[in-house]
Amino acid sequence: MSDQLEKDIEESIANLDYQQNQEHHETEQDKDKEHQDVEKQSSEEETKGIEHVTDSNTDVIGVTKSQDTEEVIENSPVDPQLKEQQESTTKMSLSERDLVDEIDELFTNSTKTVTENNQPSETNKRAYESVETPQELTPNDKRQKLDANTETSVPTELESVNNHNEQSQPIEPTQERQPSTTETTYSISVPVSTANEVERASSSINEQEDLEMIAKQYQQATNLEIERAMEGHGDGGQHFSTQENGQPSGSSLISSIVPSDSELLNTNQAYAAYTSLSSQLEQHTSASAMLSSATLSALPLSIIAPVYLPPRIQLLINTLPTLDNLATQLLRTVATSPYQKIIDLASNPDTSAGATYRDLTSLFEFTKRLYSEDDPFLTVEHIAPGMWKEGEETPSIFKPKQQSIESTLRKVNLATFLAATLGTMEIGFFYLNESFLDVFCPSNNLDPSNALSNLGGYQNGLQSTDSPVGARVGKLLKPQATLYLDLKTQAYISAIEAGERSKEEILEDILPDDLHVYLMSRRNAKLLSPTETDFVWRCKQRKELLLNYTEETPLSEQYDWFTFLRDLFDYVSKNIAYLIWGKMGKTMKNRREDTPHTQELLDNTTGSTQMPNQLSSSSGQASSTPSVVDPNKMLVSEMREANIAVPKPSQRRAWSREEEKALRHALELKGPHWATILELFGQGGKISEALKNRTQVQLKDKARNWKKFFLRSGLEIPSYLRGVTGGVDDGKRKKDNVTKKTAAAPVPNMSEQLQQQQQRQQEKQEKQQQEEQQAQQSEQQQEPQQEQQQEQQQEQQQEQQQEQQQEQQQEQQQEQQQEQQQEQREETQQTEQEQPDQPQEEQQQEKEQPDQQQQEKEQPDQQQPDQQHPDRQQQEQIQQPESSDK
């Protein structure tokens, strides 16, 4: 399409040249007649007409007395030849304007077709400029030839007037030759047609002089044909020939650089001529600019780099909203998901949720590599390399978006840190240790309304901060200090398992002796804060413990990796607003446009969640009932954005110093007897009621946490905590060594850690099975022994029964004997009565009977055979008295 446009323009230029040649030929024929008519006029009339022309040309500011000038022009006679010449000139200008209009129509048609073909409009624009400018200059050159004779005729007329009026006021040649600007010429509004014709003739003369000046300045700027230009400046004819033959094309003239000493910058006339030449190009340039602005308004960006920056920096700045979006998605997953779900997402990429999380992490990592291939954590130097230095004053072009850029960097670095700990991004402990303070201790407080997701492309207000980005870090708080020390410990364990360096070298890198100097330099402070002082002291204690560690339990078991992960993600999920926005993030309000019911529900929800300290009693139930979210009034997207969770029936309540002192005093008095402690310090306690809002479970957990703190810190356990059960080693098993690691101490792989946990569970089950088998075997071995014992017991029981039977028999025998003795006594008495002569024999028998009883007692073994024949004894006893009777 551009070739066809060039052909059309060339044809139109050729037609214009042909018309101008014809008009120039006609003007040459009328030249002689014009001089003759001018000489016939009277000197007075000629003087009045010439004064009117010169006054109209030399008045730069504008003719203030237009009425006087109009009267002079009306009274002055006008030659018909001059009128015809002026009419031909106006016709020529009209034809030129028509040709320019045709070229404009061709250009607009070409731009429409080009935009339909998805081609840039600048190509057609440049083609138009390169072709149109010669078309603009060529008629001007021809006009110089056309007006050359007219210009020479005017001085002759002026000379005749000067000769005729020598006694009157002389007219200097400089005033006669002084041109007037195009703007001044067209600013004169004369209603008479003759005045307009005279002004048009003078404008052609002024335009010729302006073009001569532009050509001369161009030759001086390019340092070409200087001598020739100087000669042309002295000789008018030579100068015209130079203008015809040596004038360059319009495109090169406009695109050339005007030197600082050029007359174009000092002469109003030349500046006006230069402006008139470039006016048509400016029209097309402004039209294309309006078209491009209308197109870009449909393609907004949150942040737009200036067009004069290098293309690479423009790409990095314009891509920040994309990087911010990906980092925000990763952080939302961490903030809204429980710890176990996060571990499952990172360790199970085969599932649908795990594959989605893996793709999101990969996309985030790929986008981040645009900024740096080597450094995992980004700074402002990666966004604008060579322009923006970390810790230095922010460049003025970035100040309107300074807080937006800094908040994006914080999101990206925090998401990178968490992904590295999960093992989804390969980053070693070295980078985590070096960047911990930058990520978890923000210094500047940012406004959440300046987030890239909330900004528009036309918001260019100044965003200032307390200090330059990256100049310093914030204060180290207690939770951050605990995480920092645990991170250093995990880095030491990983480096020791790699086995490439000694303990002393690793500890000197991770826990240096001049750690306090490093903390003060990062914060630009002269003194350490109390938390930092405590942190330095704990680091020294941990260093001695790790250096002299000789216990049988491995360090990887003593300081478990999953315990550190749980503490890390719990802290991030609770303080994610502070990590991104600083202190202003804690009081951040919802700035989105919600439904009418949303704000009321959010106020009720936040009002209930901001009362965690109101507990009813030691039962642990919350006194304030949590608000219920109505799903019929609130949108699902609004509930997700507000992170509304179901409130738990019991809220955690922070321990006060008074409660901690009471618990310590109670442990010193009674030890870990929680019911007794509540009797002394609970509701209606005998000593005080400091623990009236605590339960036995809370007391036990608090005491265990105290004991774990001393164990992890390597400190001596106080006497009042020695009776408390539990410790760091509860529920832990020995872990297998991770595969070979580098000296950079890589972060443990999540899948490997889970496999190790499964192996531990399998080992535990196998041990339980072995114990059960051993128990069964021991039972089987004990069965015969039990049978023997049972037999022995049965025998013993039988013997006891026999003894009891014997005792019973003996008792029966004794009773029988006593009965027999009584009977015998009765019989003896009867016999005594009947036979009184025999008393001596009875006495002897009575004496013999106790002797027999004594013999029976002395010889118990002889009683058994006697018992077997009781009848026999009776017979003997009966026979004895019979014998006595005889």
Curated annotation (Swiss-Prot):
Residues 616-627, 771-821, 830-842, 875-886 have a biased composition (Low complexity). Residues 2-41, 747-835 form a coiled coil. InterPro entries: Homeodomain-like_sf (IPR009057), Myb_dom (IPR017930), SANT/Myb (IPR001005), Telomere_rpt-bd_fac_dimer_dom (IPR013867), Telomeric_DNA-bd_trans-reg (IPR052833). One of its GO terms (molecular function) is protein-macromolecule adaptor activity. The keyword RNA-binding does not apply. Residues 648-703 form the HTH myb-type domain. Residues 1-208, 231-252, 589-629, 721-886 are annotated as: Disordered. The keyword Nucleus applies. It is found in: Nucleus; Chromosome, Telomere. Residues 674-699 bind DNA. CDD domains: SANT_TRF. Keywords: Cell cycle, Chromosome, Coiled coil, DNA-binding, Nucleus, Telomere, Transcription, Transcription regulation. One of its GO terms (biological process) is rRNA transcription. It comes from the Eukaryota. GO terms for cellular component: chromosome, telomeric region; nucleus. Induction: Expression is under the control of transcription factors SWI4 and SWI6. Residues 107-122, 149-206, 601-615 have a biased composition (Polar residues). Residues 22-54, 139-148, 729-739, 761-770, 844-860 have a biased composition (Basic and acidic residues). PANTHER family: PROTEIN TBF1 (PTHR47807:SF1). Essential transcriptional activator that binds the telomeric double-stranded TTAGGG repeat and negatively regulates telomere length. Involved in the regulation of gene expression. Bind both the promoters of ribosomal protein genes and the rDNA locus and activates transcription at these loci. Recruits FHL1 and IFH1 to promoters. This is Transcription factor TBF1. It comes from Candida albicans (strain SC5314 / ATCC MYA-2876) (Yeast).
